[in-house]
Design a protein with these regions (language model features):
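Glycine/proline-enriched, intrinsically flexible loops and inter-domain linkers
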Residues: 2-95, 100-123, 128-277, 281-523
Length: 523
């Protein structure tokens, strides 16, 4: 795993390019190993099959060092959760402790995304060297609807159980009864506690794998060298982002959501210092629905966009954010205050932010702009998926059909697994022809997904771009809007809005047609 000879005593203030590459890849490798462990040991379809999880490594003050290429909206926001833990628990953090966090106002995204955070001490248990975090989307964490993705929540308590740096493991002892009490003592308790516990234990195992690998790295290279190169890795990422910024131009964009909310963004480039200011002044106030995006989500979307402009193979880390200055007014729906509902802000508004930023930079037409969040369940079953669509076109490239875009990178569950674990049939799943916007370079097509139910359940859809189409750029046409409907077992069609909850019966078919991406350039 490690080179046999390492210059433990040759630590300088200048990075050796060979060792810089070694450490960049080594940190990412450790995060990927954490992810493999999590996938192999998790119980839920959501984590094991859909891969809706992320793993990352942080330094002793909570700065992101490296991550595996998992879910962008997780990766850009987890540092805020780690820093919240450090600020909250501080001197009480002890060897063998592990914490749970999902508070959207302390670095969380939405309540189903629960982060397990482990402090990593040196082998003498004297000093914290790192923090490890694994974030997984729980198939159900309580709330007013099965699957914990309620389309019509207006208060954070309606979306599930909140963990605010909850002590999950104390000095190596798993606090199972305290966890069960926390999951059940709520107006809207969790529905599948055994699965929650199993997935949390899988996340603990993932962090333990990362701990072993980090200790091996320190043993091999020495702490001084490891510390030096974790900073070099961040410095290298910062330089790469500054280089990408140096060729950009000022821009602004106004982006409209189906619910009437508006994102206004102005990007100002400081060429002399290779910095960018991203100003969301003028954006709509906090909403009385759940499309409010926590500050950590907005930051993650900005970080994602600027990371995608970098051509070099760098890990996403704290260095990427140093050249970026954000202005996000408190109380707007991109920086809401408690107790705003946020479940769609993470999955839907994050997509809108990315589209708005690309629009301001003039780089890419809108992608589908939604994750098409589909949940169904009852007291026995709970399932959640995000459904792919079309990506936007840009100068010199066409969009891609049937792909997860921007802030999500999750899989769809294999039909065989889905049908084995749940009383449903995947009746069809196909590309939606001609849904991408036309242009010199056309946007990618969306998809059509039809799920047939064999048992009565509650089904929910939380989606966007059902009224306003994904925009084209430079003369390109907009992509097609999405569509939601239920085909009842008697053949009647019930059209649904972008956010809806319906009761489905055996033989009913839920139909989701996802948006296409916008085109770029005149035909």
């Amino acid at each position: 795993m490690f080179p046999l000879n390492s210059p433990r005593s040759e630590i300088t203030t200048v990075a050796d390019p060979i060792y810089l590459e070694i450490f960049k890849n080594l940190y990412q490798f450790i995060a990927e190993e954490m992810g493999i462990t999590l996938q192999n040991t998790a119980a839920s379809v959501n984590i094991k099959e859909r891969l809706d999880f992320s793993c990352a490594i942080f330094d002793e003050v909570g700065n992101l060092i490296a991550n595996a290429p998992h879910i962008p909206v997780h990766l850009g926001s987890m540092a805020d959760s780690v820093k919240s833990l450090i600020q909250d628990k501080g001197e009480t953090i002890r060897p063998g402790n592990v914490y749970l966090a999902n508070n959207p106002y302390n670095g969380g995204t939405h309540l189903p995304d629960v982060t397990v955070i482990s402090p990593i001490f040196d082998r003498q248990n004297q000093e914290i060297l790192f923090y490890l975090a694994s974030r997984g989307h729980q198939a159900d964490i309580g709330g007013i609807t099965p699957g914990s993705m309620p389309p019509h929540s207006v208060h954070i308590s309606e979306e599930g159980i909140l963990f605010d740096n909850f002590l999950l493991v104390a000095a190596g002892q798993f606090r199972e009864q305290e966890l069960i009490n926390h999951l059940t003592n709520s107006p809207f308790p969790a529905r599948n506690i055994a699965q929650n516990i199993a997935d949390f234990q899988a996340q603990i195992a993932a962090n333990a794998k990362g701990e072993r690998e980090l200790h091996n790295m320190v043993d091999r290279y020495g702490l001084a060298m490891v510390k030096a190169y974790q900073q070099f890795v961040q410095d290298n990422a910062e330089l790469a982002v500054r280089k990408a910024i140096s060729v950009l131009k000022d821009g602004e964009f106004t982006y409209y959501l189906d619910n009437g909310a508006v994102i206004k963004v102005r990007i100002t480039i400081d060429i002399d210092n290779c910095q960018a200011t991203i100003d969301f002044t003028g954006t709509s106030d906090q909403l009385n629905n759940n499309f409010n995006a926590p500050l950590a989500v907005t930051r993650a979307a900005v970080l994602y966009v600027f990371r995608t402009l970098v051509e070099e193979a760098i890990p996403l880390n704290a260095g990427c954010f140093k050249p970026l200055h954000l202005i996000i007014p408190s109380g707007c729906f991109l920086n809401p205050v408690y107790p705003a509902a946020v479940v769609a802000g993470n999955v839907e508004t994050s997509q809108a932010i990315v589209n708005a930023l690309y629009g301001a930079l003039g780089i890419q037409a809108a992608s589908q702009g939604t994750m098409n969040n589909f949940t169904f369940g009852n007291q026995k079953y709970q399932y959640y998926e995000t459904i792919c669509g079309g990506s936007g076109a840009g100068a010199n490239f066409a969009g891609t059909a049937a792909v997860q875009t921007q802030m999500t990178n999750s899989r769809l569950t294999d039909p065989e697994v889905l049908e084995m674990r749940y009383p449903v049939l995947v009746e069809s799943f196909s590309i939606r022809p001609d849904s991408g916007g036309k242009g010199q370079y056309s946007g990618g097509d969306g998809v059509i997904r039809r799920i047939k139910f064999q048992e009565s359940m509650t089904a929910n859809i939380l989606s966007g771009n059902r009224e306003i189409p994904p925009f084209g750029l430079a003369g390109g046409k907009a992509g097609k809007i999405g569509r939601n409907a239920v085909e009842r077992n008697d053949g009647t069609i019930e059209e649904l809005p972008g956010t809806a909850t319906v009761e489905v019966n055996p033989g009913d078919i839920f139909i989701i047609e996802t948006p296409g991406g916008g085109g770029y350039g005149n035909c």
